[in-house]
UniProtKB/Swiss-Prot annotation:
PANTHER family listed in its UniProt record: POLYNUCLEOTIDYL TRANSFERASE, RIBONUCLEASE H-LIKE SUPERFAMILY PROTEIN
Transmembrane segments: none
Gene3D superfamilies: YqgF/RNase H-like domain
Name the record gives this protein: Putative pre-16S rRNA nuclease
Organism: Listeria monocytogenes serotype 4b (strain CLIP80459)
EC number(s) on file: 3.1.-.-
Main location: cytoplasm
SUPFAM superfamilies, A to Z: Ribonuclease H-like
Gene Ontology MF terms in the entry: nuclease activity
Function: Could be a nuclease involved in processing of the 5'-end of pre-16S rRNA.
Pfam families referenced in this protein's UniProt entry, alphabetically: RuvX (PF03652)
């Protein structure tokens, strides 16, 4: 069963997909979105769901360090609800505290240029979110 992981930001959505056995996560792409224009990438996510025969989606929930839900987490919850209604598959919210920071550190340690980091950070964060989910549920 393939599972999709999403890191939803204000400008991009990082996408990762599990292997068919649900053990490992691989980055797929970064979808550009525009909250001001109400363009959220739902259609592209649905295309990827069909292409990879995804059965479940995990959306990162960026809780505050004190476990409260802030504005960014509220946006992620709404995104997950709308996505679930559009694709007709279960969508799970998963605590993603510090994944973007961890992704940035990983890329810096790998000596990836700032420009390239900007291009791949959300995809790597999606991989980390999905891998955390897979490690916990398998």
């Amino acid at each position: 069963m393939r599972i999709m992981g999403l890191d939803v930001g204000s400008k991009t959505v990082g996408v990762a997909i599990s292997d068919p056995l649900g053990w490992t996560a691989q980055g797929v792409e970064t979808i550009q979105i525009d909250e001001n224009r109400k363009q959220f990438g739902y259609d592209r996510v649905k295309e990827l769901v069909l292409e990879y025969e995804v059965e479940k989606v995990v959306v990162g929930l960026p809780k505050n360090m004190n476990n409260t839900i802030g504005p960014r987490a509220e946006s992620s919850k709404i995104y997950a609800e709308v996505l679930e209604s559009r694709i007709g598959l279960p969508v799970v919210l998963w605590d993603e505290r510090l994944t973007t920071s961890a992704a940035e550190r990983t890329l810096i340690e790998a000596d990836v240029s700032r420009k390239k980091r900007k291009e791949v950070i959300d995809k790597l964060a999606a991989v980390m979110i999905l891998q955390s989910y897979l490690d916990t549920t398998n």
